[in-house]
Structures are given as structure tokens and as C-alpha cells.
From Swiss-Prot:
Keywords: Ribonucleoprotein, Ribosomal protein. This is Large ribosomal subunit protein uL30. The keyword Amino-acid biosynthesis does not apply. It comes from the Archaea.
């Protein structure tokens, strides 16, 4: 049990986007992408940068790009690409039903570490009137369009002029091109 003086570690939040397709994906890479819920090309997930998740991202380094997402971009992704179970769009009315005032409030709470995850687990029991620590029934991935203006190369890393691998805060520019 943690003492009252100990702080909970707040890991950075990363957006991870799959850029390479399904054919010729090795089995171990496909399994890791499946664990990250990146089952299709141009699908994005937002993850907490814990050591175990970072190990999975390093393993699929040649299939994805990732970087630190900011609250404004996350709010825009939730507004435009957020889906709830039944493939219905995530709306402001739905958020208000669960006690959230805006997309920006949810995004800021997630980025700051106030809430641990955006999407609740399947067995989450929501109570009316209480604000949950996540968005009930939100799908844990976002389907994006191919980027406007295209990609440089899905065979080279970002550091050498391609698109794969770590790109830091510049991931926000790519996400905005893909909305």
C-alpha cells in the first residue's frame, strides 16, 4: 500500500499510428500490433508510456509512428473520430450524460494524468450521476484517413526523412493532416 506522501508516477501519453499494412507482417509483430489494437493501416491508439507499453512500441518500431500527443489534438480526435459501441459517433451530449462538460475537459484530464485511460474496460459498471474515470463504451482506437499531402516513405525512419518511428510532438501535425 502506498504511503500518503508517495506520488503516483504520471507517464507521458503517446499517440501511436500504424502506417504499414497487413500483408507480410511477421507473426510476432502482428501479435504485438493486435495487443496495441492497431489491426488496420491508419489506425491510431492513445497509450500511457509505461515501460511495458514502450517495450511493445519499440518492438513494432518498423510498422508504426508515435509521439507525444497534446490536449488540443486529442480533443479534436475525440470530436471528429471518436466512436462508441455500435459505431455511433461520440457526441457532446453523450459526454455530458456521463458528467464531462467538453471534449477539451476529457483530453486535458487524460493528458494531465487525472484519468488513466480514455476507454473503459468491457466489464466496467457505470453508475448514473457519478463521473466515471473514463468514457464508457468508447472504442479504444481511432480510424483515420490517409494523410493529406501523402507520406514521405513508410520504409525509412523519421530521423532519416521517412515516416516510421518516434517523431515527438510533430505527431500532432500528422494527426491533423489525417483527420
Amino acid at each position: 500500500m502506498m504511503a500518503a506522501t508517495e506520488q503516483k508516477t504520471v507517464y507521458p501519453r503517446y499517440a501511436v499510428i500504424r502506417l504499414r499494412g497487413i500483408p507480410t507482417t511477421p507473426g510476432d509483430i502482428a501479435a504485438t500490433l493486435d495487443l496495441l489494437r492497431l489491426r488496420r493501416k491508419f489506425t491510431m491508439v492513445v497509450v500511457v508510456g509505461s515501460p511495458s507499453v514502450m517495450g511493445m512500441i519499440e518492438r513494432v518500431n518498423d510498422w508504426v509512428t508515435w509521439g507525444e500527443i497534446d490536449a488540443d489534438t486529442l480533443a479534436e480526435v475525440l470530436r471528429k473520430r471518436g466512436r462508441i459501441v455500435g459505431d455511433k459517433p461520440l457526441t457532446l451530449e453523450y459526454l455530458q450524460k456521463w458528467g464531462w462538460n467538453s471534449f477539451e475537459e476529457v483530453a486535458l484530464a487524460y493528458i494531465s494524468g487525472e484519468i488513466e485511460t480514455l476507454a473503459c474496460k468491457k466489464d466496467f459498471k457505470a453508475r448514473e450521476g457519478q463521473r466515471p474515470p473514463c468514457i464508457p463504451y468508447l472504442k479504444p482506437f481511432f480510424r483515420l484517413h490517409p494523410p493529406r499531402g501523402g507520406l514521405n516513405s513508410v520504409k525509412l525512419h523519421f530521423s532519416v526523412g521517412g515516416d516510421l518511428g518516434y517523431r515527438g510532438p510533430l505527431i500532432n501535425d500528422l494527426i491533423k493532416r489525417m483527420l
